[in-house]
């Protein structure tokens, strides 16, 4: 497996320790996935923000990673564990939650991420974009693969961050056209008049999947009978619901 020149340079430590660590992760992921090449990525979206889900390990990891480098492509950040204005209402039973939460956010910011704190990076306007992304948020993955020309695998927070710091990802999975083939056919014979209808459709599609089906990249429905015009909100409702069942597109 031949490395792109810049990725090899990062792996050798020529661009600092932060990017060297990220490059090592990208290369290790490529070996694990059996990838034969790497692709240049245009945008990344990183999950793993809440101190409750990431714990002290996330804080230590980010503290260890920060300091010698920043992201090389536009990168947005997923939602945090709370709104600081709603702390009392949320009644979060976690010691020093707010302080630790903002420590994590500031660590990401120091790496150059846009602290958008949103799980819908497509709200920034990607309908006309094309190329490759590295997104670690299931509803965002389903939306962009379904409604735009921007292609992404369903990444982890760590793989999306490693790609953000290097600009590269292993070429595998949904990056390859042969893996983006519908494996379910859905015929619509009813009117979809409300956003709830679109959400129910996505939910219903997901519930048809059986554990014994051989669909390594998840269910990918080909939906027939949809109206010629679908609003942005309806698209969002459909793919967000279907993503709950592992639909990547």
Q: Language-model features: where?
A:
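Non-transmembrane, aqueous-exposed alpha-helical and coiled segments at domain scale
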Residues: 1-249
């Amino acid at each position: 497996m031949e490395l792109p020149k810049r990725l090899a340079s990062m792996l050798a430590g020529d661009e600092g320790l932060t990017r060297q660590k990220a490059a090592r992760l990208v290369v290790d992921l490529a070996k694990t996935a059996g990838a034969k090449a790497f692709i240049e990525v245009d945008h990344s979206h990183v999950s793993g923000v809440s101190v409750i889900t990431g714990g002290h390990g996330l804080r230590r990891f980010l503290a260890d990673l920060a300091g010698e480098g920043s992201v090389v492509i536009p990168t947005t950040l997923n939602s945090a564990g709370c709104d600081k204005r709603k702390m009392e209402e949320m009644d979060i039973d976690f010691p020093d939650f707010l302080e630790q939460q903002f420590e994590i956010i500031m660590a990401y910011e120091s790496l150059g991420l846009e602290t958008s704190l949103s799980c819908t990076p497509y709200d920034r306007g990607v309908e006309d974009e094309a190329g490759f992304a590295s997104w670690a948020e299931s509803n965002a993955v389903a939306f962009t693969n379904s409604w735009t020309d921007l292609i992404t695998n369903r990444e982890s927070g760590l793989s999306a961050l490693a790609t953000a710091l290097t600009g590269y990802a292993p070429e595998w999975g949904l990056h390859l056209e042969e893996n983006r083939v519908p494996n379910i056919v859905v015929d619509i014979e009813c009117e979809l008049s409300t956003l709830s209808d679109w959400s129910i459709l996505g939910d219903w599609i997901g519930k048809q999947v059986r554990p014994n089906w051989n669909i390594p990249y998840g269910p990918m429905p080909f939906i027939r009978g949809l109206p010629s015009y679908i609003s942005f909100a309806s698209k969002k409702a459909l793919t967000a619901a279907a993503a709950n069942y592992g639909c990547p597109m």
